[in-house]
Amino acid sequence: MNSLRVLKIFRSVSRSIRIPASNGCINLGRNAYRVQLAKAPFSFSSIRRSSHTAGNPRSKLINALSSEIDYEKNQVLSEISLPPVNYDIEDVQGSAVVVLKAKHGDENIRITMNVSQDVTDAVPEEQDFTEFEDEQELQNQGESAEDEFPNEDLGRFQPCTIEISKPGNGALVFEATALDDGFDIENIYFSKDIDMLTSDSLEAEWKRRKQYLGPSFKELDPELQDLFHSYLEERKIDESLSSFIVSFGLTKELKEYINWLESVRQFLK
């Protein structure tokens, strides 16, 4: 995709950016822009094609929904392999939230993802878009944004929260983005109060806002960052798991979209 086009998209997004109030743990950083475009598999093209179908508005809408359902069901979905060993999945139809659980010794591991999270939820208010604004200057110098930021290529992604807790000893929480080739970590938190750190309640969110829970992961010494990645990999929170999360998230999102279309169509009949 042309980098200037990406710039226009994110300038538009930046005007309406907000931080979600429902979860104090989700606050992804600069890698969150990695293709929400590629993440959304829906074209809605069949709806436009059927807009001139004969009949009253309700019949037209039902026909359009049926066309869209057929179109999406014909989309080729890659086979989703089983999750890495020791991980159990909590996946409820109709829910956008998927949870992976595992044990490592006396530790409880919980990885949460929300497949409906969009760009306005994934990009924080303080997101710096200046790196994109230098695109024209780079081109004038005979360079491209791809040369300047070789690791910021567009690719599939799924925001997630990684929780590692020990009963009576607190919890370590990583805000991350699962990519095809591993996890990109943005923030790391620790607290002795597991409920305060991991709960979605308003009371827990209020407590989190008043406490220092940890730094931005990118601000840590590079050696510390590497050691934290090794710590996660020892618990099988690695490239294999991140690739699975990305693929599972895409498939889950498509299935929920189809279920939604079918439910609306049934309501209209």
Curated annotation (Swiss-Prot):
Main location: cytoplasm
GO cellular component, one term: mitochondrial matrix
GO biological-process terms attached to the record: cytosolic ribosome assembly; mitochondrial ribosome assembly
Keywords: Cytoplasm, Mitochondrion, Transit peptide
Classification via Gene3D superfamilies: Mitochondrial glycoprotein
Annotated compartments: Cytoplasm; Mitochondrion matrix
Family of the protein in this entry: Belongs to the MAM33 family.
PANTHER family for this protein: COMPLEMENT COMPONENT 1, COMPLEMENT COMPONENT 1 Q SUBCOMPONENT-BINDING PROTEIN, MITOCHONDRIAL
UniProt name for this protein: Mitochondrial acidic protein mam33
Species name: Schizosaccharomyces pombe (strain 972 / ATCC 24843)
